[in-house]
Design a protein with these regions (language model features):
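Short Pro/Gly-enriched beta-strand edge/turn motifs at strand-loop
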Residues: 40-48, 191-192, 210-221
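Active-site activation/catalytic loop segments of kinase-like enzymes and analogous catalytic loops
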Residues: 259-295, 309-325
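Active-site acidic catalytic loop and adjacent metal/ATP-binding pocket
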Residues: 54-68, 72-73, 105-107, 215-260
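ATP-binding pocket architecture of kinase catalytic cores
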Residues: 66-176
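All-alpha amphipathic helical-bundle segments outside canonical DNA-binding/catalytic cores
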Residues: 297-309
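Conserved NTP-binding catalytic cores of kinases and kinase-like/nucleotidyltransferase enzymes
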Residues: 1-109, 240-243
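A glycine-centered beta->alpha junction motif in the catalytic cores
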Residues: 111, 134-151, 193-198, 311-326
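A cross-family kinase active-site recognition segment
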Residues: 148-203, 223-225, 255
């Protein structure tokens, strides 16, 4: 669980300074009073307590106790992503309606899953409250039960793998406008080749040589791209009694190959907000076993899995000061 009050997700900056610089609030209390006012006036919900707030880049998350139970309130000031966020929120509603364990957005009084808030000031109990210093895209989700995935629990990891396969299957059958989502339409051989030529920093030369060799011998992946989660890892997976109870954060959904999404999840599965370490091999194997219990990989996907896992692993190396051992894990 994140600490009470205000905190940062994965950034080593003072949260109070970030809150004021990015959103214009001079205190945690000012921000939570504004959240309470928005919930009352735009969603018809009564906030009883706002216990936690976390800032990540241009985004904020607030945990709220309300008359409708626990809520997770999310907003973003990244205006260039507003259309994408609206689409991903609609996608959440569609997935929840089909039984996928995701938080189903709570509809506002205007009948919307997500609202763009432009008004700087808002009135609550005859008190004028200062809102953010910018337009924000705002959504309200129910808080799901569970704890973040513990990758030492292999049964929970297998359950997470099975859940990812179910998400891929459901996304493939869900009719949504994919035009706003980023698309990885270039062939994998070309994408990886361009990365090797222009972006490989040489931190794991043996792994790079292995990737070059594997890439030279494989045929192009025989699979269509489709919507995938793109950030499936411990920080976005909730479990209870070794079973997946919730998958969070569909804000980074892209159009890509499912096996690439699985390979990326294998590499990053154990990462939380400030604890970034490579995923042990046994854990990766459990994730894949769980996935294939629902959707077995094709022969072409099986050939590509090792290549994609190696590529995502190379991209994960933070730099020369690799204290967590990402390079040695390859």
């Amino acid at each position: 669980m994140l600490p009470l009050g205000l905190s940062m997700l994965g950034e080593s900056v003072e949260p109070e300074a970030a809150l004021e610089e990015r959103f214009g609030f001079n205190s945690f209390g000012a921000a939570t009073r504004w959240v309470s006012a928005v919930l009352e006036q735009t969603w018809g919900l009564t906030a009883l307590e706002c216990s936690r707030m976390a800032i990540s880049d241009q985004n904020a998350i607030v945990w709220v106790a309300s008359d409708r139970g626990g809520l997770v309130v999310k907003w973003s000031r990244a205006t260039e992503r507003f259309a994408n966020l609206e689409a991903s929120t609609r996608l959440l509603s569609a997935l929840a309606a089909q039984g996928v364990p995701v938080p189903s957005p709570i509809t506002s009084l205007n009948g919307l899953d997500r609202e763009t808030l432009l008004v700087r000031e808002i009135l609550l109990d005859r008190e004028t409250l200062e809102g953010p210093s910018c337009a924000v895209s705002f959504t309200v989700l129910p808080e799901l039960a569970g704890e973040w995935l513990n990758v030492q629990d292999h049964a929970a990891v297998r359950s997470a793998g099975a859940c990812l396969a179910e998400i891929h299957r459901t996304l493939g059958a869900t009719h949504v406008d994919g035009s706003v989502f980023s698309s990885r339409s270039t062939g994998l051989k070309e994408r990886i080749g361009v990365w090797l030529e222009n972006f490989d920093r040489g931190f794991a030369p043996d792994a790079t040589r292995r990737l070059v060799d594997l890439l030279a011998r494989v045929s192009e992946l025989d699979d269509q791209t489709r919507l995938v989660h793109n950030d499936f890892r411990a920080a976005n997976i909730l479990t209870r009694n070794s079973q997946t109870t919730g998958v969070l954060d569909f804000d980074d959904v892209v159009i890509d190959h499912r096996v690439s999404d699985l390979a990326k999840a294998s590499v990053y599965l154990g990462t939380l907000f400030t604890d970034w370490r490579p995923t042990p091999i046994a854990v990766r194997q459990s994730l894949r076993a769980g996935y294939e219990s629902v959707r077995p990989l094709s022969r072409s996907e099986t050939e590509w899995f090792e290549i994609l896992e190696l590529w995502h692993g190379l991209m994960a190396i933070p730099g020369e000061n690799d204290t967590a051992g990402w390079a040695s894990a390859l």
